[in-house]
UniProtKB/Swiss-Prot annotation:
One annotated GO molecular function: 3'-tRNA processing endoribonuclease activity
Residues of the active site: 65
Name of this protein: Ribonuclease Z
Organism: Saccharolobus solfataricus (strain ATCC 35092 / DSM 1617 / JCM 11322 / P2)
SUPFAM superfamilies noted in UniProt: Metallo-hydrolase/oxidoreductase
Length: 291
Protein backbone atom coordinates (compact mmCIF):
# COMPACT_ATOMS: atom_id res chain seq x y z
CA UNK A 1 0.00 0.00 0.00
CA UNK A 2 1.25 3.47 -0.93
CA UNK A 3 -0.04 6.76 0.44
CA UNK A 4 0.60 10.08 -1.32
CA UNK A 5 0.21 13.35 0.60
CA UNK A 6 -0.15 16.44 -1.58
CA UNK A 7 1.68 18.95 0.62
CA UNK A 8 1.94 21.67 -2.02
CA UNK A 9 0.20 21.75 -5.39
CA UNK A 10 0.90 25.30 -6.52
CA UNK A 11 3.47 26.82 -8.87
CA UNK A 12 5.90 29.72 -8.93
CA UNK A 13 4.78 31.46 -5.75
CA UNK A 14 2.42 30.37 -2.97
CA UNK A 15 -1.21 31.45 -3.00
CA UNK A 16 -3.88 31.43 -0.32
CA UNK A 17 -5.01 27.98 -1.45
CA UNK A 18 -1.85 26.32 -2.74
CA UNK A 19 1.65 26.03 -1.34
CA UNK A 20 4.74 25.29 -3.41
CA UNK A 21 5.43 21.80 -4.82
CA UNK A 22 6.03 18.99 -2.34
CA UNK A 23 4.68 15.44 -2.24
CA UNK A 24 5.18 12.88 0.51
CA UNK A 25 5.03 9.25 -0.60
CA UNK A 26 4.72 6.66 2.17
CA UNK A 27 5.25 2.97 1.69
CA UNK A 28 5.44 0.83 4.87
CA UNK A 29 8.46 2.32 6.55
CA UNK A 30 9.98 4.17 3.58
CA UNK A 31 8.99 7.83 3.33
CA UNK A 32 9.94 9.69 0.17
CA UNK A 33 9.69 13.45 -0.36
CA UNK A 34 9.36 14.55 -3.98
CA UNK A 35 10.35 18.19 -4.45
CA UNK A 36 10.61 20.62 -1.59
CA UNK A 37 9.20 24.08 -2.13
CA UNK A 38 9.58 26.85 0.42
CA UNK A 39 7.60 26.14 3.60
CA UNK A 40 7.63 22.35 3.28
CA UNK A 41 9.24 21.90 6.70
CA UNK A 42 6.40 23.86 8.31
CA UNK A 43 3.76 21.71 6.63
CA UNK A 44 5.49 18.48 7.61
CA UNK A 45 5.89 19.52 11.23
CA UNK A 46 2.56 21.31 11.65
CA UNK A 47 0.61 18.30 10.43
CA UNK A 48 2.81 15.78 12.25
CA UNK A 49 3.91 13.96 9.10
CA UNK A 50 7.26 12.94 10.56
CA UNK A 51 9.99 15.11 9.08
CA UNK A 52 12.68 12.80 10.48
CA UNK A 53 10.96 9.72 9.08
CA UNK A 54 11.80 10.85 5.54
CA UNK A 55 14.46 8.53 4.16
CA UNK A 56 14.73 9.74 0.57
CA UNK A 57 14.31 13.13 -1.11
CA UNK A 58 13.98 13.51 -4.87
CA UNK A 59 14.32 16.96 -6.47
CA UNK A 60 13.08 17.36 -10.04
CA UNK A 61 15.04 20.49 -10.99
CA UNK A 62 16.74 23.55 -9.57
CA UNK A 63 14.02 26.19 -9.93
CA UNK A 64 13.39 27.80 -6.56
CA UNK A 65 9.76 26.80 -6.14
CA UNK A 66 10.90 23.16 -6.14
CA UNK A 67 14.09 23.36 -4.07
CA UNK A 68 14.18 26.41 -1.78
CA UNK A 69 12.56 24.48 1.07
CA UNK A 70 15.24 21.78 1.11
CA UNK A 71 17.71 23.64 3.33
CA UNK A 72 15.03 24.20 5.95
CA UNK A 73 13.97 20.56 5.94
CA UNK A 74 17.55 19.36 6.36
CA UNK A 75 18.24 21.94 9.08
CA UNK A 76 15.13 20.82 10.98
CA UNK A 77 16.27 17.22 10.71
CA UNK A 78 19.54 18.24 12.34
CA UNK A 79 17.80 20.15 15.12
CA UNK A 80 15.70 17.04 15.78
CA UNK A 81 18.93 15.05 16.27
CA UNK A 82 18.61 12.88 13.21
CA UNK A 83 21.11 10.01 13.01
CA UNK A 84 19.96 8.03 9.97
CA UNK A 85 21.43 8.57 6.53
CA UNK A 86 19.41 10.84 4.23
CA UNK A 87 19.43 9.80 0.57
CA UNK A 88 19.00 12.52 -2.06
CA UNK A 89 18.38 12.27 -5.79
CA UNK A 90 18.41 15.28 -8.06
CA UNK A 91 20.07 17.31 -10.81
CA UNK A 92 23.86 17.53 -11.02
CA UNK A 93 24.00 21.01 -9.46
CA UNK A 94 22.00 20.07 -6.38
CA UNK A 95 24.97 18.82 -4.34
CA UNK A 96 26.96 22.02 -4.91
CA UNK A 97 23.90 24.11 -4.10
CA UNK A 98 23.43 22.35 -0.77
CA UNK A 99 27.03 22.27 0.39
CA UNK A 100 27.68 25.87 -0.62
CA UNK A 101 24.61 26.86 1.39
CA UNK A 102 25.84 24.79 4.35
CA UNK A 103 29.21 26.53 4.16
CA UNK A 104 27.81 30.07 4.07
CA UNK A 105 25.29 29.39 6.83
CA UNK A 106 27.82 27.51 8.98
CA UNK A 107 25.55 24.48 9.14
CA UNK A 108 27.12 21.08 9.65
CA UNK A 109 24.60 18.20 9.41
CA UNK A 110 24.81 15.74 12.29
CA UNK A 111 23.89 12.90 9.94
CA UNK A 112 25.20 11.49 6.69
CA UNK A 113 23.80 12.75 3.39
CA UNK A 114 24.31 10.44 0.43
CA UNK A 115 23.61 11.52 -3.15
CA UNK A 116 22.37 8.66 -5.30
CA UNK A 117 21.13 8.15 -8.87
CA UNK A 118 18.50 5.54 -8.01
CA UNK A 119 17.26 3.50 -5.06
CA UNK A 120 16.56 -0.18 -4.61
CA UNK A 121 15.59 -2.25 -1.57
CA UNK A 122 13.57 -5.40 -0.96
CA UNK A 123 10.26 -3.57 -1.38
CA UNK A 124 10.62 -0.66 -3.83
CA UNK A 125 12.75 0.88 -6.55
CA UNK A 126 13.08 4.57 -7.40
CA UNK A 127 14.33 5.61 -10.81
CA UNK A 128 14.36 8.83 -12.81
CA UNK A 129 13.27 9.70 -16.32
CA UNK A 130 13.93 12.63 -18.64
CA UNK A 131 11.44 15.48 -18.71
CA UNK A 132 11.35 18.53 -20.99
CA UNK A 133 11.72 21.80 -19.08
CA UNK A 134 13.80 24.94 -19.58
CA UNK A 135 16.67 23.61 -17.46
CA UNK A 136 17.98 20.15 -16.54
CA UNK A 137 15.01 18.27 -15.11
CA UNK A 138 13.90 14.76 -14.26
CA UNK A 139 10.80 12.92 -13.18
CA UNK A 140 10.54 10.09 -10.67
CA UNK A 141 9.12 6.58 -10.92
CA UNK A 142 8.47 4.75 -7.64
CA UNK A 143 7.68 1.07 -8.08
CA UNK A 144 6.67 -1.51 -5.51
CA UNK A 145 8.11 -4.91 -6.23
CA UNK A 146 5.66 -7.69 -6.98
CA UNK A 147 4.89 -9.84 -3.97
CA UNK A 148 4.01 -13.52 -3.78
CA UNK A 149 1.13 -14.24 -1.41
CA UNK A 150 -0.71 -17.35 -0.36
CA UNK A 151 -4.23 -17.73 -1.78
CA UNK A 152 -6.11 -17.70 1.52
CA UNK A 153 -9.51 -18.11 -0.10
CA UNK A 154 -8.41 -21.31 -1.82
CA UNK A 155 -6.90 -22.63 1.42
CA UNK A 156 -10.15 -21.97 3.24
CA UNK A 157 -12.22 -23.49 0.44
CA UNK A 158 -10.14 -26.68 0.59
CA UNK A 159 -10.06 -26.55 4.42
CA UNK A 160 -6.27 -26.46 4.57
CA UNK A 161 -5.53 -24.96 7.98
CA UNK A 162 -2.35 -26.74 9.09
CA UNK A 163 0.18 -23.92 9.57
CA UNK A 164 3.10 -26.26 8.80
CA UNK A 165 1.62 -27.08 5.40
CA UNK A 166 0.90 -23.41 4.69
CA UNK A 167 4.44 -22.42 5.65
CA UNK A 168 5.95 -24.96 3.24
CA UNK A 169 3.70 -23.76 0.43
CA UNK A 170 4.82 -20.18 1.13
CA UNK A 171 8.42 -21.38 0.90
CA UNK A 172 7.68 -22.78 -2.56
CA UNK A 173 7.77 -26.42 -1.52
CA UNK A 174 5.49 -29.24 -2.63
CA UNK A 175 3.86 -30.86 0.38
CA UNK A 176 1.68 -33.93 0.98
CA UNK A 177 -1.55 -33.30 2.84
CA UNK A 178 -4.32 -35.85 3.45
CA UNK A 179 -2.95 -38.09 0.72
CA UNK A 180 -2.78 -35.31 -1.86
CA UNK A 181 0.28 -33.52 -3.26
CA UNK A 182 -0.10 -29.77 -2.94
CA UNK A 183 2.01 -27.80 -5.39
CA UNK A 184 3.00 -24.24 -4.41
CA UNK A 185 2.17 -22.80 -7.84
CA UNK A 186 -1.45 -23.81 -7.24
CA UNK A 187 -1.69 -21.86 -3.98
CA UNK A 188 0.53 -18.83 -4.51
CA UNK A 189 -0.65 -15.65 -6.23
CA UNK A 190 1.40 -12.68 -7.40
CA UNK A 191 0.27 -9.28 -6.12
CA UNK A 192 1.41 -6.67 -8.60
CA UNK A 193 3.28 -3.78 -7.05
CA UNK A 194 1.89 -0.25 -7.37
CA UNK A 195 3.62 2.39 -9.50
CA UNK A 196 3.72 6.13 -8.91
CA UNK A 197 5.10 8.65 -11.42
CA UNK A 198 5.83 12.34 -10.83
CA UNK A 199 6.94 14.63 -13.64
CA UNK A 200 7.97 17.82 -11.91
CA UNK A 201 7.86 20.63 -14.48
CA UNK A 202 7.62 19.54 -18.11
CA UNK A 203 6.09 20.31 -21.47
CA UNK A 204 4.48 17.47 -23.43
CA UNK A 205 7.30 15.02 -23.85
CA UNK A 206 7.60 11.58 -25.49
CA UNK A 207 10.14 10.45 -22.89
CA UNK A 208 7.50 11.04 -20.22
CA UNK A 209 4.90 9.00 -22.12
CA UNK A 210 7.38 6.15 -22.58
CA UNK A 211 8.41 6.18 -18.90
CA UNK A 212 5.01 6.30 -17.21
CA UNK A 213 3.10 3.68 -19.19
CA UNK A 214 0.57 1.84 -17.05
CA UNK A 215 1.37 3.53 -13.73
CA UNK A 216 -1.28 3.56 -11.02
CA UNK A 217 -1.05 7.33 -10.63
CA UNK A 218 0.62 10.01 -12.74
CA UNK A 219 1.23 13.34 -11.00
CA UNK A 220 1.72 15.68 -13.96
CA UNK A 221 2.54 19.35 -14.51
CA UNK A 222 -0.72 21.18 -15.28
CA UNK A 223 0.41 24.75 -14.77
CA UNK A 224 -1.97 26.37 -17.24
CA UNK A 225 -5.55 25.87 -18.34
CA UNK A 226 -5.06 26.62 -22.03
CA UNK A 227 -2.17 29.01 -22.69
CA UNK A 228 -0.16 28.98 -25.94
CA UNK A 229 2.78 30.37 -23.94
CA UNK A 230 2.91 27.28 -21.69
CA UNK A 231 5.59 25.67 -23.83
CA UNK A 232 7.71 28.85 -23.86
CA UNK A 233 8.07 28.42 -20.11
CA UNK A 234 8.54 24.65 -20.27
CA UNK A 235 5.15 23.76 -18.82
CA UNK A 236 2.00 21.87 -19.78
CA UNK A 237 -1.63 22.81 -20.17
CA UNK A 238 -4.31 20.69 -18.52
CA UNK A 239 -5.19 19.06 -21.84
CA UNK A 240 -1.54 18.11 -22.38
CA UNK A 241 -1.48 16.20 -19.10
CA UNK A 242 -4.75 14.45 -19.96
CA UNK A 243 -3.52 13.43 -23.42
CA UNK A 244 -0.32 12.00 -21.94
CA UNK A 245 -2.30 10.05 -19.34
CA UNK A 246 -4.50 8.66 -22.11
CA UNK A 247 -1.59 7.73 -24.38
CA UNK A 248 0.34 6.12 -21.53
CA UNK A 249 -2.73 4.17 -20.30
CA UNK A 250 -2.25 5.28 -16.71
CA UNK A 251 -4.91 4.40 -14.15
CA UNK A 252 -5.28 7.83 -12.51
CA UNK A 253 -4.09 11.35 -13.36
CA UNK A 254 -3.42 13.96 -10.67
CA UNK A 255 -3.20 17.52 -12.01
CA UNK A 256 -0.71 19.64 -10.09
CA UNK A 257 1.62 22.68 -10.24
CA UNK A 258 -1.38 24.97 -10.70
CA UNK A 259 -0.52 28.59 -11.51
CA UNK A 260 -1.55 31.07 -8.77
CA UNK A 261 -3.43 33.08 -11.43
CA UNK A 262 -6.30 30.57 -11.11
CA UNK A 263 -8.56 30.88 -8.07
CA UNK A 264 -11.32 28.73 -9.55
CA UNK A 265 -9.97 25.44 -10.94
CA UNK A 266 -13.29 23.76 -11.75
CA UNK A 267 -12.71 24.27 -15.48
CA UNK A 268 -9.32 22.53 -15.20
CA UNK A 269 -10.95 19.32 -14.07
CA UNK A 270 -13.74 19.53 -16.66
CA UNK A 271 -11.24 19.94 -19.50
CA UNK A 272 -9.06 17.09 -18.27
CA UNK A 273 -11.98 14.70 -17.81
CA UNK A 274 -13.25 15.29 -21.34
CA UNK A 275 -10.05 13.62 -22.51
CA UNK A 276 -9.16 11.40 -19.55
CA UNK A 277 -12.13 10.75 -17.23
CA UNK A 278 -10.04 9.39 -14.37
CA UNK A 279 -8.50 12.76 -13.52
CA UNK A 280 -8.33 14.45 -10.13
CA UNK A 281 -7.11 17.88 -9.01
CA UNK A 282 -5.91 17.48 -5.41
CA UNK A 283 -6.07 20.28 -2.87
CA UNK A 284 -3.17 20.93 -0.55
CA UNK A 285 -3.06 18.49 2.38
CA UNK A 286 -5.27 15.95 0.63
CA UNK A 287 -4.00 12.41 0.25
CA UNK A 288 -4.71 9.29 -1.73
CA UNK A 289 -4.10 5.60 -1.03
CA UNK A 290 -2.94 3.27 -3.79
CA UNK A 291 -3.52 -0.43 -3.06
Amino acid sequence: MIQIFFLGTGAGSPSKKRKLPAFLVRREGVNILLDCGEGTQYTLMNYKLGINSIKIIGISHMHGDHVFGLLGVIASMGLLDRKETLYILGPRKLKDFLYTSFEYSKFNPSFKIEFIDNYNDENITISTFKTCHTIESQGYLIMEKDRVKIDEEKLEKEKIRDWRVIRKLKEGKTVEYNGKLLKPEDYLVIKRGSKVAYTGDTMPCQSVVDSVKGVDILIHDSTFLDEPSAYTYGHSNVTDAAKIALEASVKLLALTHISPRYEDVSEHLKMARRIFPKSILPDDLSYITIK
